[in-house]
Amino acid sequence: MLVLVVNCGSSSIKYQVREVTPEGSEPSPYTSSMPAINENIPLATATAGMAGDQVITKGLIENIGTSEIQDHTQALEILARRLDEELGGRTIDAAGHRVVHGGERFSAPVLVNNEIIRAIERLAPLAPLHNPAHALGLRAIQKTYPGMPQVCVFDTAFHRTMPEKAWRYAIPEQWYEMDGMRRYGFHGTSHDYVTGKACEFLGIPREQFNTVVAHLGNGASVTAIREGRSYDTSMGYTPLAGLVMGTRSGDLDPSVVTAMLERKPGMSAQDMNRILNNESGLQGICGDSDMRAVEQRADSGDERAQLALDMAAYRLAKYIGGYHVAVGGAQALIFTAGIGENSPGFRALVCDQLGALGVRLDASRNEHPEGNVARISFPDSAVEVLVVATDEERAIAEATAALVWERVKN
């Protein structure tokens, strides 16, 4: 089965076409008559028995709305022509979409119909920069590929298993009831995917696996995984909460926001949102948001860069310690995503602070991890330390194929 994986932004479409084959079965072309939608199949269950590691083609369409490409429909038409040429007449069987916010409704991947698209649009206040664009992409594919099944995979869905004590904020009840103010969590597809890969590597049944996953990119989050499910996570109502990130502040005393708004009469809520999301984090501390550049500066003796690294590592180490308690003793610590997979220096800076947990990092293995899943701790480390390559597009492709294939079989 050929699956088009799309990530629609407000002015861009990032895409991959992947070959996904249900084990023991031949791929099947899609049908335009799909049975009922199921919103309760977990991603880990949906993708069982799927192999989606072959990328046929990938690319990016940019400047939608600010160039000759007027809207997402036109962008998808251009993409369809491009894919016709690149695929040599092969047919796209289904499309899988990354959707940032599924709110409280969506706890698993879903097959798309018009009501699902409207539900995603209604969640726009929770992700105003993302969900409207996702809906545009869904409708554009409906027009470009009539009848082709589409599946949405939600960044927030994996975290729907958190207990209420973890996702509730200690704020007035009506703020939650009326305005949806609660912890949602993000990067769920990645956290879910690497947890599964770690289980396979360690030979531990998922329902018996307790771990802490650190997804470290320019945006970063850490998740407590208890019995294979999300139990707590650092991001909150928005992706601003939690760790020190490239340009995001992470956790902050709310009084800082109110005090600055009072002291700066001309500052708006929009200004504050921009500053905390785009001008803070590593950028705010040392003037650079790129971890590689910050590490290079620190190595050359730059004190501000070293402070930025120390703050980011300390914040993460504190979360890991707390989540070790939350899961009842982590069997593994997993590093993933751009920084997590590619920065041995930052991994060491974090793990050096975890001696109280019995973590013992093997410096040689940490410098040169091998394979998509690598153990970088000593054999006598009380907590296994792993580097696991994430692949959110593969997870989306496999979830898409699983739902479509199940409906075709039934």
From Swiss-Prot:
It catalyses: acetate + ATP = acetyl phosphate + ADP. Pathway: Metabolic intermediate biosynthesis; acetyl-CoA biosynthesis; acetyl-CoA from acetate: step 1/2. Gene3D superfamilies: 3.30.420.40. Belongs to the acetokinase family. Keywords: ATP-binding, Cytoplasm, Kinase, Magnesium, Metal-binding, Nucleotide-binding, Transferase. The gene is ackA. This is Acetate kinase. It is found in: Cytoplasm. It comes from Kocuria rhizophila (strain ATCC 9341 / DSM 348 / NBRC 103217 / DC2201). Its EC number is 2.7.2.1. Catalyzes the formation of acetyl phosphate from acetate and ATP. Can also catalyze the reverse reaction. The lineage of its organism: Bacteria, Bacillati, Actinomycetota, Actinomycetes, Micrococcales.
